[in-house]
Regions:
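Intrinsically disordered, low-complexity segments enriched in polar/charged small residues
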Residues: 9-10, 200
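Bacterial N-terminal signal peptides that target proteins for export
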Residues: 1-8
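An exposed, glycine/acidic-rich loop-and-rim segment of catalytic or binding clefts
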Residues: 21-368
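Hydrophobic h-region of N-terminal signal peptides that target proteins for export
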Residues: 12-20
Length: 368
């Protein structure tokens, strides 16, 4: 009987070892100022993810369709030069210090006003013109994945405090886990997210208008003409923003709705009912052509659904594909835009002695 137990235990350990994702690293060229860039490949039976130290970004995710054929389901470029030249899409990157927008690039902490350089319609977007997406991070292999680390000095893009950030990408079965942590030497504001553009048809084919989206949120945060929240939390009931039932993205995207006109499509924040209460469902996506599905869970209080409205056919990505309007969609799990200037929104203040923690999981599957 003891021998049987030993065999069972050995089998369990062997299966566990076999299930572990493989991780490899290689050089991926240099930036224009000569900084070496690396790329990591994390592979499991169902998922292969490539992540580069330039912007701590996801370069590719290979996932199977309903026939078992794998294809790349995120937009991006074949090399560092492509990402470095493109300063507007943020393909696959970690954006920060403050993902999304800060009105007029200005906020105050304890009576001191701080200014972030403006880079989007008179506002600061994704941490300013030299945010985290433009930095070369330090990468290291960890169990089932890679950890990206960055030290942002006091005053970087106008933000106070030296901020130390760690982002862990791990692959477990069909899921890509992203775990964020950060500490600061001075009170500061922080909002980290990943800016991957998903196209579940694979290899950048077609648009996402036929994709069926579900967001289990009763409310969203409307924006003004420069895409800054008005401060209101509005009901989705009776609007094109009601995705509580699975709905094709293209079904209402051209409706005569003032909010849709502002961003020429969807580019708003949805309010999650489970924010701050552990992992909760943020969204699901289904591509009827490939059968691929994407399920997003997060600990964050919001998710920005962006339908790729500003892709305009001027960028050629992987596989020689020209990225036209609606070529990909983003589901950016986050705190709300302009939270530092909206006391009613969940706080993004981080103080010395505190550690920011958040997690988002992207799980891929198929529907036959």
């Amino acid at each position: 009987m003891k021998f049987k137990h030993v065999l069972v235990g050995t089998a369990i350990l062997l299966m566990s070892a076999l299930a572990q994702a493989s991780v490899s690293k290689t050089s991926w060229g240099k930036t224009t100022d000569g900084k070496p860039v690396e790329i990591f490949t994390v592979s499991d039976a169902d998922l292969t993810v490539r992540i580069t130290t330039f912007g701590a970004r996801v370069v590719s995710i290979e996932a199977p369709d309903k026939s078992g054929k794998k294809a790349d389901v995120v937009l991006g470029y074949d090399n560092v030069a492509g990402y470095e030249k493109d300063t507007s899409t943020y393909f696959g990157s970690i954006v920060g210090r403050y993902g999304n927008r800060i009105a007029n690039g200005t906020f105050s902490i304890d009576g001191t006003t701080y200014h972030v350089p403006l880079n989007n319609n008179g506002n600061a977007l994704h941490g300013g013109p030299a945010g985290f997406s433009t930095k070369v991070w330090t990468g290291k292999e960890i169990h089932d994945g890679v950890e990206m680390s960055l030290v942002s000095p006091d005053g970087d893009m106008g933000f106070p405090g030296t901020l130390t950030v760690h982002v862990r990408y791990t692959v477990e079965g069909k899921s890509l886990h992203i775990n964020y942590s950060a500490t600061t030497t001075k009170p500061t504001v922080i909002n980290l997210t990943n800016h991957s553009y998903f196209n579940l048809a694979g290899d950048g084919k077609g648009t996402i208008l036929q994709d069926v989206l579900m967001i289990p949120a009763d409310r969203y945060t409307p924006v003004n003409p420069t895409q800054i929240p008005t401060g209101e939390s509005a009901t989705v009931e009776g609007t094109p923003f009601d995705f509580r039932k699975p709905t094709a993205i293209g079904a209402r995207i051209h409706d005569r709705n003032e909010q849709l006109k502002i961003g020429d499509g969807y580019d708003q924040n949805w309010v999650m009912s489970g924010g701050g209460k552990g992992l909760h469902l943020a969204a699901t996506v289904y591509d009827p052509t490939s059968g691929r599905t994407l399920t997003v869970t997060t600990t964050q209080p919001g998710v920005q659904f962006y339908s790729g409205n500003f892709l305009d056919g001027t960028k050629t990505g992987k596989f020689g594909i020209v990225y036209a309007k609606y070529a990909g969609l983003c589901l950016e799990t986050q705190h709300f835009p302009d939270s530092p200037n909206e006391p009613k929104f969940p706080s993004t203040l981080l103080k010395p002695g505190q550690t920011l923690h958040s997690e988002t999981v992207f799980t891929f599957g198929v529907k036959r």
